[in-house]
């Protein structure tokens, strides 16, 4: 995807190579419902379902969870926390921060490894099981109140749940 402007809104456009790189990175990081709940633990996961992110932020802090791809992506994409460019580049080795910017997923403060990158969307895993078997996917939505600290606008795109 690339991003075009439509008035004050950013409008994503498909770029299949970048989307494929994102998918490969999310799969390699194991950004799944089960892995996220295992990383957070039952208390932080339950709190996050109640829109209380403090325990999840602590569980994904680099000094607690390390700097691997999964804690970085959970902290950034699910919790809406800014991370440094170097950490995001390591978490998304195929897509990189530059590719995530082109997809309209993030906004970087600069090009340096220590420059902050903030998420522009909420991207989280979902899973279901039916007669055909288990399936997992990721769903993008606008950042919620937990990430923005502000009331939702009228044109807010909700996530699921």
Model-derived regions: residue spans:
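S-adenosylmethionine-dependent methyltransferases
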Residues: 1-10, 14, 21-48, 53, ...
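Accessory substrate-recognition/RNA-binding modules or partner subunits associated with SAM-dependent
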Residues: 16, 23-117
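Non-catalytic substrate-recognition/targeting regions of SAM-dependent transferases
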Residues: 84-160
């Amino acid at each position: 995807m690339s991003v075009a402007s439509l008035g004050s809104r950013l409008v994503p456009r498909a770029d299949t190579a970048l989307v494929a790189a994102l998918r490969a990175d999310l799969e390699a990081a194991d950004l799944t419902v089960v892995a996220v709940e295992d990383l957070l633990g039952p208390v932080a996961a339950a709190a996050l379902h109640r829109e209380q992110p403090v325990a999840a932020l602590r569980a994904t802090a680099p000094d607690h969870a390390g700097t691997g791809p999964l804690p970085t992506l959970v902290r950034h994409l699910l919790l809406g926390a800014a991370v440094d460019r170097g950490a995001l580049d390591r978490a998304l080795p195929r897509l990189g921060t530059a590719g995530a910017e082109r997809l309209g997923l993030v906004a970087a403060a600069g090009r340096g490894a220590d420059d902050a990158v903030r998420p522009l969307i909420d991207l989280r895993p979902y899973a279901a099981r039916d007669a055909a078997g288990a399936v997992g996917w990721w769903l993008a939505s606008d950042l919620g109140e937990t990430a923005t600290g502000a009331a939702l606008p009228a044109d807010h795109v909700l996530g699921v749940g």
